[in-house]
Design a protein with these regions (language model features):
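Flexible, glycine/small-residue-enriched loop-and-beta-strand segment within the central core
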Residues: 3-15, 19-20, 26, 30-34, ...
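General secondary-structure propensity
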Residues: 26, 149-150
């Protein structure tokens, strides 16, 4: 009976997946059904059931997205990124390859007093390759985090932060400078 149920649920799953309006590459585990139209999810990526991903996103290879994650529209996540519980990424954000997000400032293997610290990446922010974002922080609107930066404090809107620890080196409205 259990094997028959597994076969039936597999067939239902196949029918459901044919009707989706987003792309999932081979060798990807996508447990979430909360994925927006036009989103592309590439190989060797694992998205857990509770994750919510907006429309027109591009999620690279070898990405892991945990349950309590919110990702807005038009977000690009490059290869090798892990996004843990409590991370909220607003619209139009770029996350470079191998960016590391953390959600527990004091991790232990058997931590019963685990405190999830939420992180917010605001609209239009860009995070360079190999940057590390410590938990409980806010990356400001249209801010830029340089490659390899270790962000230990909040980054204000329209700022450039670089280094270890990351420090603000410039403040500007980047979108108005481009136009």
């Amino acid at each position: 009976m259990n094997s028959l149920l597994k076969i039936f649920s597999f067939r239902v799953d196949l029918k459901f997946r044919k009707k989706r309006n987003y792309f999932v590459a081979k060798y990807t585990i996508c447990d979430s059904i909360n994925i927006g139209d036009g989103t592309k999810i590439w190989s060797f990526t694992h998205i857990l059931k509770g994750a919510k991903i907006g429309s027109l996103c591009n999620i690279g290879e070898n990405v892991f997205i945990e349950n309590y994650v919110l990702i807005g529209d038009k977000v690009t996540i490059k290869n090798g990124v892990q996004i843990w519980d409590g991370i909220h990424i607003e619209d139009d954000v770029f996350i470079g390859p191998n960016v590391t997000f953390t959600n527990d400032r004091y991790p232990f293997s058997n931590n019963r007093n685990y405190k999830l610290e939420e992180t917010l990446v605001k609209k239009g922010a860009s995070i360079g390759a190999n940057a590390t974002i410590l938990p409980g922080l806010e990356i400001g609107y249209n801010s830029l985090i340089g490659a390899g930066a270790v962000v230990t404090k909040n980054v204000p809107d329209n700022s450039v932060a670089v280094g270890n620890p990351a420090r603000i080196i410039k403040r500007a409205d980047f979108h108005s400078e481009i136009n």
